[in-house]
């Protein structure tokens, strides 16, 4: 499941053509929808994937590689 989440994250980020590979909560929702999972489950798995680090801003939490 970790590999599926990682691949979904990378696919969505490539589709968005983002710089810095940011995974805001909205992307977590997109990954969850794609994999038929809960967004919180996606975020918990994403935290455990090497290279994805949890960070915070004033408005949202995010993950990045």
What is the predicted function of each stretch?
Residues 1-34, 40-65:
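Surface-exposed, interaction-prone regions with an acidic/low-complexity signature
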């Amino acid at each position: 499941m970790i590999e599926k989440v990682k691949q979904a994250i990378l696919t969505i980020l490539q589709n968005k053509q983002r710089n810095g590979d940011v995974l805001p909560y909205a992307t977590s929702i997109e990954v969850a929808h794609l994999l038929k999972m809960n967004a919180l489950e996606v975020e918990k798995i994403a935290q455990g994937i090497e290279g994805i680090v949890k960070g915070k801003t004033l408005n949202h939490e995010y993950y990045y590689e």
